[in-house]
Amino acid sequence: PCVERNGMIFGYLGPGDPPPLPAIDSLVAPDSHVFAFKGFLECNYLQAVEVGIDPAHASFLHRYLQDEDTDDAYGRQFRGGTGDEDVPVTWIMRNFPAPTIDVQRTDFGLQIEARRHLSESRDHVRVTNLIFPNAIVIPMSKSMAITQWHVPVDDHNCYWYAHFTSYDAPVDTPRMREQRMELYRLPDYKPRVGRFNQWGYDPSEQEDETYTGMGMDINVHDQWAVESPGAI
């Protein structure tokens, strides 16, 4: 009843024969093009799903007050460029904070489109897919997407399990892992920041670098948003 696919093990706990895994990109791509990782959150799984599918919060929670060279954005969400003109996503999110949101029901869950009208000739469109009951597929860059499952530990804690899927070159696995190990520790994959150190909050950073003052990794921003209310 268990299947290993691109660094993850999926188990079927229902009656009868297990159904086939869905043919989503991260499960059919070659393992050379997929990087797997996970992280612990002190919130219930539904809170983690909600923060992942919300298409508007990025303009505030993940707002960077300065734009960086988009060539240095590999492996980091909301940091690259978009479109043929390579406009920094940080600039778009900062200057167009109120997207038009359209939600469509699908046979797998929901498709959520966030459209930011940049000019008379340009729109920025970001599409998020929610695969019921607990998976999301979100764009990470022009050539990479994240497929992420949110799995309960108990009523107040969960793990996220993510596939980072590249649509062009093979994934730079050592680089992706090094980036994420800056925030997480082994063997339990718990974050190095949290309520115990105010999620790394730095008021001086908040003045001129980030909206939250909690570092450059968006996982910390989301972690603060779902953990700070306390157990729900």
Name the predicted role of every residue range.
Residues 4:
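Short, Gly/Pro- and small/polar-rich lid/capping loops
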Residues 10, 15-232:
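C-terminal catalytic domain of Rieske-type non-heme iron oxygenases
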